[in-house]
């Protein structure tokens, strides 16, 4: 039914797939960061600008939730409070 050459080609393709799986086996799973606000029960506040500085890069950009580990609800609130603190001149818009 199958020629010998066809069977060998299929085996070589299967071996290549196994090599591909071995490459992906080095993938590491990271522990999900917990939200600092959910754990402590605190809410972000624009008056606590020293605490808000932890969520801003050196250029003054707001860090995303995948880096900070905050929940979606608190990330939205955090962005709002950072923008309020910027407007009140407690935090800089852009760092020089």
Curated annotation (Swiss-Prot):
Keywords: Ribonucleoprotein, Ribosomal protein, RNA-binding, rRNA-binding. One of its GO terms (molecular function) is structural constituent of ribosome. GO terms for biological process: translation. One of its GO terms (cellular component) is cytosolic small ribosomal subunit. It comes from the Bacteria. The keyword Zinc does not apply. SUPFAM superfamilies: Ribosomal protein S18 (SSF46911). Belongs to the bacterial ribosomal protein bS18 family. Binds as a heterodimer with protein bS6 to the central domain of the 16S rRNA, where it helps stabilize the platform of the 30S subunit. Part of the 30S ribosomal subunit. Forms a tight heterodimer with protein bS6. This is Small ribosomal subunit protein bS18. The gene is rpsR.
């Amino acid at each position: 039914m199958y020629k010998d050459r066809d069977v060998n080609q299929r085996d070589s393709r299967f071996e290549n797939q196994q090599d591909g799986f071995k490459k992906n086996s080095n993938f590491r799973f990271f522990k999900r960061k917990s939200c600092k606000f959910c754990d402590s029960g605190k809410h972000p506040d624009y008056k606590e600008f020293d605490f808000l500085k932890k969520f801003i890069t050196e250029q003054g950009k707001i860090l995303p939730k995948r880096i900070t580990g905050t929940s979606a609800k608190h990330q939205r609130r955090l962005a709002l409070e950072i923008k309020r603190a910027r407007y009140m001149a407690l935090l800089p818009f852009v760092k020089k």
